[in-house]
A protein has these predicted regions:
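Mobile, glycine- and charge-enriched loop segments
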Residues: 6-27
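Conserved beta-strand termini and adjacent loop/short-helix elements that scaffold enzyme active sites
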Residues: 14, 75-77, 217-219
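Phosphate-coordination/substrate-recognition cap region in phosphate-metabolizing enzymes
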Residues: 5, 39-118
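Short catalytic helix/loop segments, enriched in acidic residues and glycine
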Residues: 26-41
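Internal catalytic-core helix/loop-beta-alpha segment
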Residues: 120-153
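Active-site metal-binding loops of divalent metal-dependent hydrolases
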Residues: 17, 170, 220-222
Length: 264
């Protein structure tokens, strides 16, 4: 006898489309990406939409929201992860990802889900404050949907099959995912990329009645672009080969006709 269809909540963590960082908006390519993303997400019955207050995320979300005829709730903490560290040599502010591997890999404390913010590499800035804000923000949001965090799991009286969609940025997205699956965000920040407009899917597992765990079933899925033979943007990725420009913004790289072929 065929079993009943599984019931699980889905959280779709969506990165904004290709950004124009100078104007906090989307590039022409980004608008095309957002339109294809909108077609994809409009086929999903979502119960709620949440969006970062930043322009590039709002513009990305607008393509989906117009198609479904709904509004999104703006959450200030969904803005790109605002935590920063202080460079031990220059004293200048740094974002807590995009470190060179040899700068962080020997810091084993950075892999500790509870104490990574106390590692010397993370001290001097406000990383712990923003990490706490991120965790609290996500837990408050989930509590509104019936899930209360306790000791790394979420308690719920009635697990549902609703879907919620978050339009956000790479750094904050990986921080959210890390919190949900109980790991430090450092290996996610340093070792993974979600290309612009990519969708990360997290679902619930209720292995004990009333106790829910989250599991990531898809990270950085850009199938809506590939199906339309659109190459994903490389924004967020450093150059494959050294070119003298240490930037994740492809618009700053020297022209290279092979660059966009990396993710075909």
């Amino acid at each position: 006898m065929k079993g009943a269809d599984p019931v699980f909540m889905r959280i779709l963590i969506v990165r904004h489309a290709e950004p124009d960082y100078v104007h906090d908006s989307l590039t022409e390519k980004g608008r095309a990406e957002a339109a294809l993303l909108g077609k994809r997400l409009s086929r999903i019955e979502a119960s709620a939409y949440y969006v970062s207050p930043l322009g590039r995320a709002k513009e990305t979300a607008s393509y989906t929201l117009r198609l479904v005829g709904k509004n999104a709730v703006t959450l200030p903490w969904l803005a790109e992860f605002r935590g920063y560290t202080l460079d031990h040599q220059s004293g200048k502010k740094r974002i807590p990802w995009d470190y060179h591997t040899d700068e962080w890999v020997r810091h084993k404390q950075l892999l500790d889900r509870d104490d990574w913010t106390d590692d010397p590499l993370m001290l001097g800035g406000n990383v712990k404050q923003i990490w706490d804000e991120t965790k609290d923000g996500m837990d408050v949001l989930l509590q509104k949907h019936g899930y209360r965090r306790q000791n790394g799991i979420y308690l719920c009286e009635n697990n549902t099959d609703e879907t919620i969609i978050l339009f956000r940025h790479f750094g904050i997205g990986m921080a959210i995912l890390a919190h949900l699956i109980n790991v430090s965000p450092l290996p996610l920040w340093q070792g993974f990329l979600c290309v612009p407009s990519a969708v990360t899917t997290v679902v619930t597992q209720e292995r004990r009645k009333g106790e829910v765990e989250f599991r990531c079933v898809s990270l950085g899925d850009a199938s809506h672009l590939l199906q339309e033979k659109q190459n994903p943007s490389l924004a967020g990725l450093f150059p494959e080969c050294y070119n003298g420009i240490d930037s994740t913004d492809p618009n700053k790289w020297p022209a290279h006709e092979e660059a966009q072929a990396i993710l075909k």
